[in-house]
Amino acid sequence: IYDYLYGKNASTADIWKDETHTLRSLLYAMLLPSANEAAYIVADYMSGSSIDNFVAMMNDEAARIGCTGTTFTDPCGLDPGNVTTARDAYLLVRVAMGYDAFAQAAGEESYQMPASTKHDSPYTILTSDKLVSPSSNYYRPYTKGGKTGSLDDWQNFAGWHTQDGETYVSVVLHSPKTDEDPRPALTETAELMDWAFATFTVTAALDTTQPITELPIVYSSQTDTVMIYPADDMQTLLP
């Protein structure tokens, strides 16, 4: 694992060889500082020490949930053979956010990694998703969680946001980094969702208590018309 990651400028949670961690701690390590070694450790554990088997499991699961443009080639995303689309990233987030452990971890600003044989005391890891960090200029209270993905020159972000009881998923891919903004995908996500919440509202298109129309009745001795009501409520997103 460490031989593969060496020299790749991989993000890390400072997890060392021969340390012991729970899967929960490794989940936080993957989601907050994007710890590549944590992803590989989980893959090794879950697959019976076969990274290839785990990658095959990832691709099978992606296909099962409906991804059509995604191919995984490693557990952490460093390999350039990993590809996906905005639609597929949306599907992955929509499924992942349904798991309570994932949703809770993805929305945390920090986490205390436990003491171990390599760390005399617990230590703090911080999230790369600054949209959930109140101390950050990127902070947006409506963002509930998400995952960054970064290489040297660009950044991705997929996350979910809640306002007025409705939840929205956003995906920003291949946003170029600049000297002025090292987290451009977060900037673009914040601008996108600020605009969306200022521009669109969820409105009732159909209401079972409100008639759609009134129709005439030809053969009736008691009434000349009948009111038509929808069978179900329906909401829609309107500007």
Regions found by a protein language model. Give the residues of each.
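Domain-terminus/edge residues, biased toward the C-terminal soluble/receptor-binding domains
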Residues: C67-T68, P80-T84, D88, V93-P239
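Active-site-adjacent loops and short helices of periplasmic peptidoglycan-processing enzymes
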Residues: I1-R87, A96-D100
